[in-house]
């Protein structure tokens, strides 16, 4: 309930213009790794395996709000655990594509019905999922990434499950 209230407050800040970013140089790879390691033990206790695919590249710091990025990573990992069904596996990865950092978070659950995919980032949209949640978290994540001049895409992964792809620019 507390998380739902926080998400509602966050979205109201976005809608009325009180939502701000505190931009600073951020080690995006370290932020993702911190989120993965924070959740890994919790997930293990729940019977969920959280894999992390680390690319060999080191990234220059990117201009971003580290607190907001942690919020996005936490929300996406939490969503993957809630909607992963009996898949009991989550994969997180980071890589460079051109001038972008690409982060993916994938679960191995049933995926999202094709007719629902265009709506999943709308506020309060919960689709046919029986999982708990407010239907706001993904909308907030999308807004945070958009304000970082990036994109957040949600789709079904080849072989099953859902995959969320974040693209953030490497430069200013």
Predicted regions and their residues:
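Short alpha-helical Gxxx[C/S/T] motif in the catalytic ATP-binding
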Residues: 137, 141
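A conserved beta-strand-to-alpha-helix junction within the catalytic ATP-binding
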Residues: 22-40
